Regions:
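Acidic, histidine-bearing metal-coordination/catalytic regions of metal-dependent phosphoesterases
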Residues: 6-54, 184-217
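Conserved beta-sheet core of the metallophosphoesterase superfamily
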Residues: 119-213
Length: 217
């Protein structure tokens, strides 16, 4: 039941994927971007992830500038969770300044920060998605999957949450050694604090698959 601040989540299910799986959407890769874990207005994330910003205001401005430098007004952005902290003023300020049409896949922090009034500001708000971009099947979730059927037939899984960065020594670091080469952390800490285009993700995953195949000959 709703608690008055949040509304019940309903997964959008349009179309049908391979083997009868639900396929949420199909998109043109020329206008698609991915990102995660911006943590707008979250001061503690600067120390927790050793982000190179003096304060939360500087961080917010850098994230907004980087976002708008690559994302146009009519582009599509899949944000894989932990979008923003704060209340109405903070969320409104950020959403008013970001380019693009944003689909939000809910992260663990969004569960407590996302309010009902913000749902209409996104193209959709869901727990996870299964999309197709230029015939490439992609699973989107806030957290990495330990296993998923798509790993065996070329599908990707994009995620956030783990804040991958250089010399990552967090508690999730050992687990990341178990992921498939068709998985990738699109979070800002792993990608110069900037959304990635579909083509950028494609090149990264192709390189990961190539390296995996080379190491397992």
């Amino acid at each position: 039941p709703s608690n008055g601040n949040q509304q019940d989540l309903v997964l959008t299910t349009q179309g049908c994927g391979k083997n009868g799986e639900t396929m949420n959407y199909k998109f043109d890769g020329n206008k698609v971007f991915f990102t995660s874990d911006t943590h707008f207005y979250h001061a503690n994330i600067i120390n927790f992830c050793k982000r190179p910003f003096a304060n939360v205001e500087t961080m917010n401005e850098a994230l907004i500038e980087n976002w708008n430098a690559v994302v146009g007004a009519n582009d599509i952005v899949f944000h894989l969770g932990d979008f923003c902290f704060g209340g109405s003023a903070e969320w409104t300020n950020i959403l008013n300044r970001l380019n693009g049409k944003i689909y939000l896949i809910i992260g663990n922090h969004d569960l407590k920060n996302l309010r009902k009034g913000y749902y209409k500001r996104f193209e959709d708000v869901v727990m996870q998605m299964h999309i197709e971009v230029d015939k490439q099947r992609i699973y989107l979730n806030h957290c990495p999957f330990l296993c998923y059927a798509g790993a065996y037939d070329g599908a990707w899984q994009l995620f956030g949450h783990v804040h991958t960065c250089e010399n990552n020594t967090g508690k999730d670091a050992p687990r990341l050694n178990m992921i498939f080469p068709t998985q990738y952390d699109v979070g800002v800490d792993n990608n110069s604090f900037t959304p990635l285009s579909f083509e950028q993700v494609k090149r990264i995953i192709e390189k990961q698959v190539e390296q995996f195949n080379k190491n397992n000959r």
